[in-house]
């Protein structure tokens, strides 16, 4: 099980102006978290803060700036943090309708910060690509990882049916299968968190939910 990360209250870069790569990484995280987890206690926020050497509170603040740019959040009657919104708005406008490009770009940035490569981080180095191009496999892996993060966070890392909360035993299952509807592959409303047994039952057509 993944080790929990404690509060990141100081960072080597906490007094420096925000850079483009940081704002992109935070937007990438924004699209993978529900509104209720845009705070400094969320493990993914702490992990990113540690990676970019910022405080967890400062990363959480940028996340709420992005919420102030999000029409879905605003239409629901909720508001993000308006102060600082202008820093995030250009990146929102660039990537909100091109999330796949954002997710790939963010993973490249992470790999670079870890002194690694995207291929190594995704575990596809030297792999038999089964006739697919490396670019296609990278895109699939990144999108699948993002979808998993979205769904597990939305369900608070619990199987929707059994309540089991062991991440290694949870699957981000598509309601409409991945191969059948490209438009909804990354739509969190098309996902449900299941244990392996119920995921397999779903895949063979057993109706688990209405």
Please give the residue ranges for each predicted region.
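Short, Lys/Arg-enriched anionic-surface-contact patches
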Residues: 7-29, 138
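The −1 position to Zn-ligating cysteines in a subset of zinc-ribbon hairpins
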Residues: 55, 158, 171, 194
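Short helix->loop/beta-hairpin flanking segments within DNA-binding domains
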Residues: 28-40
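Short Lys/Arg-enriched helix C-cap and helix-to-coil transition segments
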Residues: 71-93
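Short Cys/His-centered divalent metal-binding micro-motifs
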Residues: 56, 193-209
């Amino acid at each position: 099980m993944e080790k929990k990360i404690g509060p990141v209250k100081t960072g080597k870069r906490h007094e420096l102006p925000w850079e483009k790569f940081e704002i992109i990484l935070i937007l990438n995280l924004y699209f993978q978290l529900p509104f209720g987890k845009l705070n400094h206690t969320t493990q993914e926020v702490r992990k990113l803060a540690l990676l970019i050497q910022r405080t967890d509170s400062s990363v959480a603040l940028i996340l709420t700036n992005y919420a102030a740019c999000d029409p879905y959040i605003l239409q629901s009657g909720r508001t993000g943090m308006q102060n600082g919104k202008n820093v995030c708005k250009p990146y929102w406008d660039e990537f909100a309708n091109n999330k796949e490009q954002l997710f790939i770009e963010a993973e490249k940035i992470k790999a670079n910060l870890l002194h690694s490569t995207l291929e190594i981080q995704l575990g596809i180095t030297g792999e038999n690509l089964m006739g697919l191009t490396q670019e296609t496999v990278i895109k699939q892996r990144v999108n699948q990882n993002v979808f998993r993060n979205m769904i597990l966070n939305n369900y608070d890392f619990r199987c929707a049916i059994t309540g089991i909360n062991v991440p290694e035993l949870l699957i981000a299952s598509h309601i409409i299968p991945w191969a059948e509807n490209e438009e909804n592959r990354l739509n969190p409303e098309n996902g449900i968190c299941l244990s392996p047994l119920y995921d397999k039952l779903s895949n063979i057509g057993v109706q688990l939910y209405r």
